[in-house]
Amino acid sequence: KPCNRLNMLLECNNSNNSINRISASSNDVGEVMRQRHLAMRLSSLKPHPCHSVELEQYPTEGNLAAAWLTKIDLGDSFEGKHVLDLGAGNGVLGIGAAFLGARRVTMVECDRTAIDVIEENIVEVEGNEFLETIHQRVDGTTIEVESKVDIAIMNPPWGVQTKHADRVFFETLFSMNVPLIHFIHSIEAEHLASLAKSNGYALHSIYQTDFRLPAAYSHHKQQQGSTRIRCYRLERLN
């Protein structure tokens, strides 16, 4: 039942290069194996180039993406849905949703180099005609897509470099009346509850974990750092 799937979501904290859909399993062991299989597939994708400090291009690692997407699928199910991946990077989230049974996946990215990487990764997806890329900057206005979006997923900029950089991502999805929005954000973010309420959404925290930050930029003094993040779910109330 849908309510039971949601409760499970909120309470739960192969050598062939051709990518196939990953079948759902009804038991815990099957879910663990499914997540591991997904993590291997996502980790094998060509990585995000991560060149822009301004765009806060921190890549979502395959293991984290797999854990998060599996939790989303447990509660909201990607099966047969149109999924929008906003600020798609190398396509790890959108392609992950495709593995989990999405009917259509639209990936929006403003970085031309990143779009090229997504296109290379899409080639590895079997029957990839249901995956689409849009080269466009997210600016708070509606993005034209071929059919109604059922679920949006994103790892938006958190506003480290530019204050409120995440707002246009939320405004875009709100303008499109997306019923379910799943996103990653810094655990220190304090504006999310009020943002959700003022736009007619309920905010749920799915779980929290560490987000690894590779030394991709010159201002990083350490080889690798990490920050604490939360994975959230927004549900439209009307």
Where are these regions (language model features)?
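Conserved SAM-binding motif I beta-strand of class I
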Residues: 104-109
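S-adenosylmethionine
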Residues: 137-230
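S-adenosyl-L-methionine
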Residues: 9-12, 21-84, 116-147
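Conserved SAM-binding loop of SAM-dependent methyltransferases across substrates and taxa
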Residues: 90-102
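Conserved Rossmann-like nucleotide-cofactor binding loop
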Residues: 113
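Conserved S-adenosyl-L-methionine
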Residues: 87
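Conserved beta strand-loop-helix elements of the APE1-like EEP
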Residues: 231-238
